């Protein structure tokens, strides 16, 4: 596709590029941000959209590895020019099946209002969530979900669930009041946006171990979430982690090899479909090691500069 191969600029996921020129409708001139490397050509948002559509149609499970980078920085010019892709369009582009670019801005370190822990069932995200809470209860809080199922005699409202009638939960759902909502064995379960807002307004960080599909609803200027993907390791590592979890009392159910293989397949599918929304990826092959790395990384967000979607600041 390139008019000249040597003119192209190599890039990969999460690279930050500075756009120097958008004069050509198909090829933009760009360079790696804060780098002395030479400038080169990259596909425009329009061409990239077409290119990704073609790649996704190929029988290649690794096709998603090509073409998307974390963000674009539009070079400021004194002369007004027509901008083909701007931050206000990011929502329209970013959440389509075809993944393209997103304009970003660099800001000072701050406490993210929401931390989203994303991962396949059985990868250990709830265990890591609980470990984060235990390590710093003054900083983190869990968004307790709601349910319409009957309350057991030994349960307290607000302990593991808030209990509401099915009619009231359905009404809240119709008003888009849930970030997640579903039905299990005839009972509704869901996490309310008002719960997240209450935690954020209290000054704490809300920890969400939500499904990947919920990212699109929470990824707004109001919540400014930091999205962490916990990737599944090998089946043998998953089994070892599961045995550790059982020994620590985190889980009681019995799992078979096919359960671990299912976790690995689901993890790959989540990464393929939502990788463009992740801020950080950890391979969760050891709970203690992953927790230590995750905790230190989240601590660094308080002081180190961060790239965020530019539309959050406009």
Task: Describe the function of each predicted region.
Residues 1-206, 212-314:
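Glycine-rich phosphate-binding loop of ATP-dependent small-molecule kinases
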């Amino acid at each position: 596709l390139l008019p000249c191969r040597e003119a192209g600029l190599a890039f990969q996921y999460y690279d930050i590029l500075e756009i120097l020129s958008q004069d050509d409708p198909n090829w933009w001139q760009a360079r790696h941000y804060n780098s002395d490397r030479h400038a080169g050509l990259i596909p425009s948002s329009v061409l990239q959209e077409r290119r990704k559509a073609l790649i996704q149609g190929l029988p290649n499970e690794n096709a998603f590895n090509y073409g998307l980078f974390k963000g674009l920085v539009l070079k400021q010019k004194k002369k007004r020019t027509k901008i083909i892709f701007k931050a206000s369009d990011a929502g329209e582009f970013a959440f389509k099946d075809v993944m393209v670019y997103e304009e970003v801005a660099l800001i000072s370190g701050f406490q993210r209002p929401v931390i989203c822990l994303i991962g396949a069932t059985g990868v250990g995200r709830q265990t890591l969530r609980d470990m984060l809470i235990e390590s710093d209860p003054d900083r983190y809080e869990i968004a307790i979900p709601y349910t319409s199922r009957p309350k057991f005699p030994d349960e307290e409202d607000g302990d593991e669930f808030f209990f509401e009638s099915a009619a009231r939960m359905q009404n809240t759902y119709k008003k888009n009041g849930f970030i997640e909502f579903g039905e299990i064995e005839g009972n509704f379960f869901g996490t309310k946006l008002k719960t997240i807002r209450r935690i954020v307004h209290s000054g704490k960080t809300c920890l969400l171990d939500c499904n990947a599909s919920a990212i699109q609803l929470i990824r707004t200027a109001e919540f400014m979430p930091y999205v962490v993907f916990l990737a599944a390791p090998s089946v043998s590592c998953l089994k070892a982690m599961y045995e550790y979890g059982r020994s620590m009392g985190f889980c009681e159910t019995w799992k078979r090899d096919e359960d671990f293989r299912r976790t690995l397949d689901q993890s790959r599918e989540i990464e393929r479909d939502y990788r463009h929304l992740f801020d950080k990826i950890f391979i969760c092959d050891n709970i203690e090691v992953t927790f230590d790395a995750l905790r230190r990384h989240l601590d660094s967000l308080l002081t180190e500069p961060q790239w965020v979607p530019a539309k959050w600041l406009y």
